Amino acid sequence: MSKKLIRYISFCGIGVYLLALFVVSVVFRDHALEWEWMLWGIGEVLFFFVLTTVLYPRWKNDEHKLFWRKVFWTALAIRLLYVVFSYYYFSFRMGQPFDSPGDAIGYYNRSVVLSRYIRKGDFGFVVNFLKGYSLGFSDHGYLIWLTFIHTIFGRSVWVARIFKALMSAYLCIVVYKLSSRTFGERTGRLAAVMCVFMPILILLTGMHVKEMEMIFLSILALERMDYLIRSKKYTLWNILFPILLIGMSFGFRTVIGMCLIFAFFVFVILSPNNLVSRKGKIVSLSVTLAVFLVFLFTVIGSEMKIVYMLNFSGTDYLARKYESLGLKYSEISKSKYLFPGAFVLPLSPMVDVAPLHNKLIHGSTFVKNFMAFFAMLSIVIAVRQRKWRNFSLIWAFELSYLTIVVFTFTSNSERYHEPAIPLILVMGAYAMTHMRHKDLKLFYVYCGLLFVALFVWNWLKLAARGIV
């Protein structure tokens, strides 16, 4: 990918965002975002596009170890600086070091209480609390992780966020390994650099919610599964480690674990015989089925059944919810209408009716909306180059996860789409490093459609409430 092309794509991304923000703010000026959130959004968009454009050409030809060091230490420095900044920023603005009074404070308070009982040696209380925890096993993982941290390091939020920064920085290396092994060195390096500067992967380090840990676990599990098959090193550790990661992912979000198992199943089936022999496929699929059955007959299995019922028996949940709240145009939120935009949705909120968290990350949301084009184009390119089998682990996870998210009550929640973002960058990097000049025509069309969609999306947010 030439320096000129990446600069041009970045220029288009910045231009579409600024134009959309300007038009929405002028047309709906009585409900425009406050200047504070506009500056956050502009900063996020410029940070991603400008730094990726400047540093990728400088780093792409570096020796492997030097490239790894630059990626990791740059990512870690940025994330640690943000951890410090966000702590004092939210303490000043919100009166506490949390971006919103929702899940973050709940996780923090519960983990501090449990850590206190552990230090007293009252493990019975902890066990009984977890058994009766209303949010179920899929929320145990993060609560146990925070409790472990607070038990050792005390009730401060600093240590948990430093761990988030470390995970987010190392995630860039994991993304590099996965994408370079799948698509080649050029793609791997571009994906890693974009990961370093992806705003949401930085913003999550300053938030006391489980998404950062969940993203790290899922991408690491995919990378280890990919390594297991491509390296053909079937040692006990190489087999057990991905299984352990999948099991841990069920403790953060049931859907993640289900999609990881499905992705590995598809990857083994579609792998060419020179990668996985027929005998190897039989053994691998047998082990996968055995692991699935073990999970199925535990508490995890009960939650998988609940997820299935929620996703495929309640596809019109959002429409009914919005209708009950008196919101107009609720019909549009039905899953059958949202599914074609699974990679793109939800769009960036640019009006003041959005929750504070969504205003804060709206620039990052736009980056995802923009990069979604290249993620979708990557599927076309993989089919065109007849390399779609090499793509199967990544697209099987991404498509299955986004499909489940769209066909449930979480389709309009950015938090539930965040685990898909690293692979959108990976797929996008593949498209950007392999696209033809003719593909730019589709890119121009998408930029125009994205601008219109952003305007309509924000109009709908206001019109549904009877504001305009």
Regions found by a protein language model. Name each.
Residues 206-214:
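Short acidic/glycine- and proline-prone juxtamembrane loop motifs at membrane-interface regions
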Residues 14-19, 76-79, 241-244, 386-406:
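Transmembrane alpha-helix segments characteristic
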Residues 63-70, 233-240, 272-289, 436-448:
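Membrane-interfacial entry segments at the cytosolic side of transmembrane helices
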Residues 176, 181, 231-237, 277-279, ...:
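Membrane-interface helix-loop-helix junctions at transmembrane boundaries of multi-pass membrane enzymes
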Residues 158, 175-197:
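Transmembrane-helix signature of polytopic, membrane-embedded enzymes
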Residues 202-203, 237-260:
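Membrane-interface alpha helices of multi-pass inner-membrane proteins
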